[in-house]
């Protein structure tokens, strides 16, 4: 008799959501994080030993991401580097904890994607440029925690796109030090330092 095992779709969804949120905020080792997220459809980040559950992005976030991908992809077409967008895991060294950080940038540019892949076709390299689009739930993490993650992890350039204030903050790193930074308020043209010639209008980024 199977009556005791019958559950509604809503009950199953509630249990899955509860399990997903149960891990958020937990401090675990990198190995434990890999075990938790293996074959797990929920999206997580792992920063400084702590697990972060990634919520589904909103409409505006995805519109601006699509705009950025189109602008970046058009510029990088025919060049040796490629543009990727989330969901796309990036694992970076965390020397302070002698461990690793695992993040999902909204958009990234990789110049080592051909050689830095494991047997499961997972990316193992270091992006040259990373873009994060702020949302209400990620403002603090993207502007503080991820800034340090990318700086210490070997990323060369980090763009923070702020739809609320219609601005883009650009950070340029060299030898794991902040080399330069700039702020572009709409309307403006964001000019990459690491990729000379890559110029993106904020009007095009925030177009709806």
Predicted feature residues:
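Gly/Pro/Ser/Thr-rich low-complexity, intrinsically disordered segments predominantly at protein N-termini
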Residues: 1-208
């Amino acid at each position: 008799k199977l009556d005791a095992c019958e559950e509604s779709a809503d009950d199953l969804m509630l249990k899955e959501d509860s399990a997903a949120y149960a891990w958020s905020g937990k401090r675990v080792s990198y190995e434990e994080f890999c075990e938790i997220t293996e074959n797990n459809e929920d999206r997580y980040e792992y920063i400084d030993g702590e697990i972060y559950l990634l919520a589904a992005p909103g409409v505006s976030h995805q519109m601006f991401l699509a705009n950025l991908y189109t602008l970046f992809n058009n510029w990088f077409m025919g060049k040796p580097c490629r543009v990727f967008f989330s969901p796309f895991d990036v694992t970076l060294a965390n020397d302070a904890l002698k461990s690793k950080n695992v993040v999902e940038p909204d958009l990234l540019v990789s110049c080592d994607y051909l050689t830095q892949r494991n047997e499961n076709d997972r990316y193992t390299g270091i992006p040259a440029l990373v873009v994060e689009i702020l949302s209400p739930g990620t403002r603090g993490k993207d502007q503080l925690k991820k800034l340090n993650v990318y700086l210490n992890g070997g990323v060369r350039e980090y763009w923070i796109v702020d739809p609320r204030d219609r601005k883009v903050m650009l950070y340029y790193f060299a030898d794991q030090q902040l080399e330069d930074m700039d702020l572009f308020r709409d309307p403006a043209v964001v000019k990459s330092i690491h990729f000379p010639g890559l110029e993106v209008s904020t009007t095009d980024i925030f177009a709806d």
